[in-house]
Amino acid sequence: TAAAQGTVTQATSKSTGVTLNKPAGVITMNNASLATATNATFTLTNSFISANDTVILTLAGGQTTPGSYNVFANALAAGSVSITLRNISGGTLSEAVVINFAVIHCS
């Protein structure tokens, strides 16, 4: 349902953390430049996340050319997860990439 979803926009840079206390939502990243073969990592703070959960991420928009990025979750902890965006395009990009996320409670 719409009440279970939220949106947040990253300020300042691609490494700036965001807070969204919803089980699913949309993160719009900052449009700072990201060189090819480079990672940008930020923290999503979210009270719905526990250390045993799974966070699913999908690139949902903001890309001129689909397939220019990889996105993955790492460093899962109670209340937060680190999200890494990697530029795999072969050139420097300055795009406000949109990431959908969903928290799946595992135990």
Where are these predicted regions, by residue range?
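Extracellular receptor-binding modules and their adjoining Ser/Thr/Gly/Asp/Asn-rich linkers
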Residues: 1-51, 75-107
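Terminal beta-strand-rich extracellular "head" domains
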Residues: 53-64
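Surface patches in mature domains of proteins
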Residues: 63-76
